[in-house]
């Protein structure tokens, strides 16, 4: 019995000494005993203070938003008068009571100009105009409000239209003009540029007082 116990203890001591030797060899070579073949399980952690450090980070996935740039103030540019064979800057005015109708036809005119190689300077909306329709009742002399008409206007500004092609271009616009939209083409002037902006009489009075 004592001989058998001595053999078991001797085998166990030999195994422990071999494992200790292999551990020392791994440490001297800089290897990790967990990932090395034949090594014993190493229970120590590589991190001790922040086990969840870096988990759940998302800021590197979100794109950095650029600061919004302020819109540049629209300034009056030099008006191109044109030549004997070519028109200067022309404004195509589209007026309608239905805003969606005026907007869709303005987009059609813009695409048509691009397809026909007519330079489009810009396309913009004019201030909405409101008109009240008054009605005189059968009895009484006081006018009564009958309806309110809202007029929407879009402008497509073009340049470089040749005089020979202008007639054909206007015929195409007239043939595709939807019902309820009024079309007018005229040369661009300084008054047209000022008409783009809404009048602010109170602000103008305050600026006049400050100056």
From Swiss-Prot:
Oligomeric and partner information: Component of the mitochondrial ribosome large subunit (39S) which comprises a 16S rRNA and about 50 distinct proteins. Interacts with OXA1L.
Q: What is this protein called?
A: Large ribosomal subunit protein mL48
Q: Where along the sequence do coiled-coil regions lie?
A: none
Keyword field: Mitochondrion, Ribonucleoprotein, Ribosomal protein, Transit peptide
From what organism does this protein derive? Answer: Mus musculus (Mouse)
**Where is the transit peptide, renumbered to this chain?**
1-27
Q: Which GO terms describe its cellular component?
A: mitochondrial inner membrane; mitochondrial large ribosomal subunit; mitochondrial ribosome; mitochondrion
Against Pfam families, the record matches this protein to: Ribosomal_S10
User: Please, which domain of life does this record's source organism belong to?
Assistant: Eukaryota
């Amino acid at each position: 019995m004592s001989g058998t116990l001595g053999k078991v203890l001797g085998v166990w001591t030999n195994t422990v000494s071999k494992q200790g030797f292999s551990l020392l060899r791994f440490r001297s070579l800089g290897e990790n005993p967990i990932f090395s073949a034949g090594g014993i399980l190493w229970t120590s952690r590589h991190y001790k203070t922040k086990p969840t450090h870096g988990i759940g980070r998302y800021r590197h996935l979100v794109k950095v938003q650029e600061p919004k740039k302020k819109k540049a103030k629209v300034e009056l540019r030099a008006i191109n008068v044109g030549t004997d064979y070519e028109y200067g800057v022309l404004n195509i005015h589209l007026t309608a009571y239905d805003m969606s109708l005026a907007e869709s036809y303005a987009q059609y005119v813009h695409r048509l100009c691009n397809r026909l190689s007519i330079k489009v300077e810009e396309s913009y909306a004019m201030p909405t105009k409101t008109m009240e329709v008054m009605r005189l009742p059968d009895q009484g002399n006081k006018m009564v409000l009958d309806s309110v008409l809202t007029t929407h206007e879009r402008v497509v500004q073009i340049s470089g239209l040749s005089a020979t092609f202008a007639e054909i271009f206007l015929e195409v616009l007239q043939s595709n003009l939807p019902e309820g939209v009024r079309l007018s083409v005229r040369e661009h002037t300084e008054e047209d540029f000022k008409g783009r902006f809404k009048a602010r009489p109170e602000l103008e009075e305050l600026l006049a007082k400050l100056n």
